[in-house]
Design a protein with these regions (language model features):
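Short strand-turn motif at the edge of the Rossmann-like AdoMet-binding core
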Residues: 52
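C-terminal "post-core" interaction segments
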Residues: 11, 15-24, 33-34, 38-46, ...
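Beta-strand-turn-beta hairpins that frame and shape the catalytic cleft
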Residues: 1-10
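P-loop NTPase catalytic core of nucleic-acid-dependent motor ATPases
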Residues: 49
Length: 190
């Protein structure tokens, strides 16, 4: 979309999945890089990310999307901090391998608009939280769910069962806790 000197990019993203065949398939992540290369080629300088219907998914895909959006000066900063109930924690930096694509979206401002709803949760909230310390994140919509926890699959092949217990609490580079959800800057109900 073009409005005056603004070239506005819009992306709706409904689930953080790297590819159709699970974690090791990166088909969708690679397609996302191509989409962002297109935004870059079109000179997009404002961006709207629609996460209203995104309940989460894989953290690596969320990191990849946030890495495409983060300002250049913040590319090697902390994306998220994961802490377990034993007091152990580790962090992931923003990361994207561009491999021949135009790469990151270079906005003329350090601002992004993100559309939210009550269904915006988990990895979607991690994206919001990870960008907050490094750019002006303007939320439009409804209060998000507040799911700031992560899970790890536990599997028993002998009895053919698996479960996903909550094992991690997720914060950002400044240790922000969003368990009550993110309140929108501009409230808007669909």
């Amino acid at each position: 979309y073009t409005r005056g000197d603004k070239k506005i990019g819009y992306l709706v993203y409904n689930h953080f999945t790297p590819g159709p065949n699970g974690y090791s398939d990166r088909t969708y992540d690679e397609e996302m890089k191509k989409i962002f290369a297109g935004f870059q080629a079109q000179g997009v300088n404002e961006f709207v990310l629609d996460l209203r219907y995104n309940g989460g998914g894989y953290e690596n895909s969320a990191n990849m999307l946030a890495g495409l959006l983060i300002p250049e000066a913040s590319r090697k900063k902390v994306f998220a901090v994961f802490s377990d109930n034993k007091g152990q924690s580790y962090s992931n930096d923003f990361c994207v391998e561009t491999k021949g694509t135009a790469g990151y979206l270079k906005l003329n401002s350090n601002r992004i608009y993100i559309l939210t709803s009550q269904s915006t949760a988990s990895s979607s909230e991690v994206v919001i939280n990870s960008l907050n310390p490094f750019m002006d994140v303007i939320l439009i919509g409804e209060l998000t769910e507040g799911k700031n926890v992560g899970m790890e699959m536990q599997k028993n092949d002998k009895y053919e069962w698996m479960y996903w217990p909550i094992t991690l609490r997720v914060t950002n580079a400044v240790n922000y806790d969003y368990s009550a959800g993110f309140k929108p800057d501009i409230e808007w109900n669909e």
